[in-house]
Curated annotation (Swiss-Prot):
Keywords: ANK repeat, Repeat. ANK repeats lie at residues 196-225, 229-252. The keyword Iron does not apply. This is Putative ankyrin repeat protein NMA1343. SMART domains: ANK (SM00248). It comes from the Bacteria. Pfam families: Ank_2, DUF2314. PROSITE patterns: ANK_REP_REGION, ANK_REPEAT. Gene3D superfamilies: Ankyrin repeat-containing domain. The keyword Transit peptide does not apply.
Length: 253
């Protein structure tokens, strides 16, 4: 479906789309939190999940830029890793199906679909808002998704019915008791570091899981632990915009 999708070229002066890109960057944390929990599900819940990012190269007449979709996403708090889903229109320095890495600040959109309902898709809705009803129908048919009201962008599952889902993922609330029991039986894993120096506390902070972070701290996780590039869990919480997590990790005087 997505591999054959049209790449949309948008002029830099298109203010609605540019504003949409800014909103996507500010809310990317919700996208990554959902993917973080998707990896813990026995049965996947997402139809797909992708990020749109800016790719560019120097051309004869100046810089060539294209916004294209990436899937198979991993995020380390600074960079997004994935596989390019689109076939570039003009760029020759990257190919469809190639593994790519982009700074999180270079994204222009994110979207995941759960039970046929799209979340994110800020630039998509901005462009749909400039279409006629007939054009929107054709656009949605090409995607195979009903994007609904172009003025509405959902961030998290059932956010209208359960606004608390913006603060904490429902899976986090549901499994925190079991997680605490695991910590009581094996707190040593909190001090394990991967090849890049990340501890479990780093990963939970990046994903915005405040309940998990709180439990880890209570069982001895070291908030001063740094990655190989010198980042603490607090650094990542601040970068992502998880204030509730940052408050837990702030040094106590």
């Amino acid at each position: 479906m997505m591999g054959d999708s049209v790449i949309y070229y948008v002029e830099q002066a298109d203010k609605p789309v540019n504003r949409a890109g800014e909103r996507a960057r500010k809310t990317f944390k919700y996208f990554w939190r959902e993917l973080f929990w998707e990896r813990r599900r026995i049965i996947p819940a997402l139809d797909f999940a992708m990020v749109k990012a800016l790719f560019f190269q120097d051309g004869e007449d100046g810089e060539i830029c294209e916004h294209m979709w990436i899937d198979d996403i991993y995020f380390d708090g600074l960079y997004i890793y994935g596989v390019l889903n689109n076939e570039p229109g003009e760029l020759t320095n990257v190919e469809q199906g190639e593994s790519v890495c982009v700074p999180v600040d270079d994204i222009s959109d994110w979207m995941f679909v759960c039970n046929g309902i799209p979340y994110g898709g800020f630039t998509i809705q901005a462009m749909r808002g400039q279409m006629t009803e007939e054009e929107r129908t054709e656009h949605d048919a090409a995607w195979g998704i009903d994007f609904g009201d172009p003025g509405q962008v959902l961030l998290v599952y059932e956010e209208k019915e359960h606004p608390e889902n913006l603060e904490e993922h429902p899976m986090c609330r549901n499994c925190i008791d079991d997680f605490r029991q695991q910590l009581s039986q094996n707190p040593d894993f909190l001090h394990e570091q991967d090849e890049d120096g990340y501890t479990p506390l780093h990963h939970e902070a990046i994903a915005g899981n405040a309940l998990m972070v709180q439990a880890m701290l209570e069982y001895g996780a070291n908030p001063a632990s740094k990655t190989s590039e010198g980042y603490t869990a607090l650094d990542f919480a601040r970068l992502a915009g998880w204030q509730n997590v940052a408050d837990l990790l702030e040094p106590r005087h």
